Amino acid sequence: MTFNYKDVHAKFGDHFPCALTGRPLNWNNPEDYEYDHIIPIARGGDNTINNLQILCTEANQAKGHLTDEEFIDLCKEVIQNQGYKLYRPIEKTANG
């Protein structure tokens, strides 16, 4: 990797949520979170701090090699297939 713990801590600080679920995460519990490539390596992404986000373990394992947008689209399909309705499109905000 082309970054280290200090780089990651400087970017995300002491308190940070999962970039996908919004769950609060804790540096002191490494089982709570995983580093994720925003653009997966398999899709041409690089191993730099700018291509890094932190996800809760469950979200990262479910996301796998998908991009965030592909994963969100998959989640929408699952929700709809299970009989739930999305009452309005979920708009992406400026903050994420």
Question: Predicted regions: what is each one?
Answer:
Residues 22-54, 63:
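Histidine-centered nuclease catalytic patch
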Residues 7, 41, 60:
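Generic anion/oxyanion-binding catalytic loop in active/binding sites
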Residues 27, 52-74, 79:
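Short Cys/His-centered divalent metal-binding micro-motifs
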Residues 3-5, 35, 49, 68:
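Structural motif detector for alpha-helix initiation sites
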Residues 1-20:
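Short, charged surface segments at domain edges that flank catalytic/cofactor-binding sites
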Residues 20-21, 75:
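Conserved short hydrophobic patches within well-ordered secondary structure
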Residues 46-62, 81-96:
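Short Fe-S-cluster ligation motifs
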